[in-house]
């Protein structure tokens, strides 16, 4: 009887142990499942391992780069590109300079006046068949009779007129200059003279009897008088004497 009781007690003990093992096994299985789900959220690409040995380096080695290095490198590249762009803009702004006298006289700039155009033509060797100096030191010039209309047409184009300019209209403007004293009519056919004030402003060195270098006008369609920097500023800010 005692032997049977011991066997039953031993069997119950084994059964309890088996139940505990089964419960523990079930709990570990549940934990493993939850752990796998959690790891799946953290690392959605489980085939990419986070072990440093997988990348061929020891765990104590520093990474080849970090995000700060990448950010700083990008900033340096951006600043370098901006610097070159600024240099390029400065170079372009230096290459494209607005003319001192615009053809149609944009806002803030003067229109090219007739006596300025005549002086420019006198300084241009290509216009010698239309207009010539008679006495350069005194500012006396003369229109060439057979080509005076050509000169007038070119003046109209420089002004931007739609209708062709004629010498008759240009001569009318010259008579208006005679009233202000800027250009004086000489008692000689097609001959005029710049006033001293205008001549001083247009060519002060020439007026003083010194040799003045007149540059060749490579672009005749430019609507401005080619003077040196000092002459241009002096002329622009000076007042005319009547």
From Swiss-Prot:
One of its GO terms (biological process) is blastocyst development. The keyword Repressor does not apply. It is found in: Nucleus. One of its GO terms (molecular function) is DNA-binding transcription activator activity, RNA polymerase II-specific. It comes from the Eukaryota. SMART domains: ETS. Expressed in lymphoid tissues, including spleen, bone marrow and thymus. According to PubMed:19037245, highly expressed in red pulp macrophages and, at lower, levels in B-cells, but not in other cells, including, monocytes, dendritic cells and other tissue macrophages. According to PubMed:10464163 expressed in pre- and mature B-cells but not in immature B-cells; according to PubMed:10187812 not expressed in pre- but predominantly in mature B-cells and at lower levels in macrophages. Disruption phenotype: Cell-autonomous defect in the development of red pulp macrophages, but normal monocyte and other macrophage subsets. Mice show normal trapping of red blood cells in the spleen, but fail to phagocytose these cells efficiently and develop an iron overload localized selectively to splenic red pulp. InterPro entries: Ets_dom, ETS_fam, WH-like_DNA-bd_sf, WH_DNA-bd_sf. Residues 112-195 bind DNA. Keywords: DNA-binding, Nucleus, Transcription, Transcription regulation. One of its GO terms (cellular component) is nucleus. It holds the Pfam family Ets. Controls the development of red pulp macrophages required for red blood cells recycling and iron homeostasis. Transcription factor that binds to the PU-box, a purine-rich DNA sequence (5'-GAGGA[AT]-3') that can act as a lymphoid-specific enhancer. Regulates VCAM1 gene expression. Binds DNA as a monomer. PANTHER family: ETS, TRANSCRIPTION FACTOR SPI-C. Belongs to the ETS family. This is Transcription factor Spi-C.
